[in-house]
Amino acid sequence: MSDTVPLQIDVDTLRTLRQSGADVALLDVREPWEFDLCAIEGSSSIPLATLPQRAGELPKDRQIVVICHHGGRSAQATAWLRHNGYDKATNLMGGVDAWARRIDPTMKVY
């Protein structure tokens, strides 16, 4: 992968990254109750409201794919992360809803 990380990717690209063994961190910024309902395997939960306080838990040297329900909150989080030095933050377009519908039909949708 080049040093330039796209601002957003779709779920098919995320699946390809994971299948290729890429070192990608998955950050889910939904509320805890949403994360408990369904989550992409391997995701870490840091709700959007707590991101400024907890950003130090995130790696700056790895690509971070930011996830929410449909892509709105994760786009906000991605913009905040990039503004604060996390140049490898990437928004997952469509969020867990798109992941459930295209990649993992066994995942609960809400």
Write out the residue ranges for each language-model feature.
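Rhodanese-like catalytic fold shared by cysteine-dependent sulfurtransferases
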Residues: M1-A25, P32-Q63, G72-Y110
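Short, surface-exposed ligand- or partner-binding patches at beta-edge/loop junctions that are enriched
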Residues: I67
